[in-house]
Amino acid sequence: MRIRPDKPGPGQESVWDYPRPPRVEPVSGRVTIELNGQRIVDTTRALRVLETSHPPTVYVPRADIVDGALRDADGTSFCEFKGRAGYLDVVAGDRVAAKAAWYYPNPSRGYEQLVDHVAIYPGRMDECTLDGELVTAQEGDFYGGWITSRGVGPFKGAPGTWGW
């Protein structure tokens, strides 16, 4: 299957121009995350991971997540680039979003910036924003990319795209 990347307009970037292996860089702008009517993240210190065909995955500093909003969850997964990830439940009041976040306690060489940062699936939260823009979650139940008007695809994640 031949993929035809969408052409980016002014101020946009194509996920097909992102590198593989992925690159880590600072997010320019403010990141907010809300669950159960509570703002659990409000930061200007987030990082994003850029990988070919994926919308950016946003990692927020643990220190910028409201106390008590994270709790350990069972299970791990492995990324060929970043290493072994652990999972976290996200908690706000009486609501628990099971395994809605992940982190790399000992990331692989080249990804050390991700220590003490957590990625949260935007589709499992009530609202995520990037610089005031409402984020759309990447399709599928594995990847946690943040789609905004700044990025164009097509994006990996939907059924039939795993082989890209």
Regions found by a protein language model. Name each.
Residues 1-164:
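Terminal leader/tail segments of proteins
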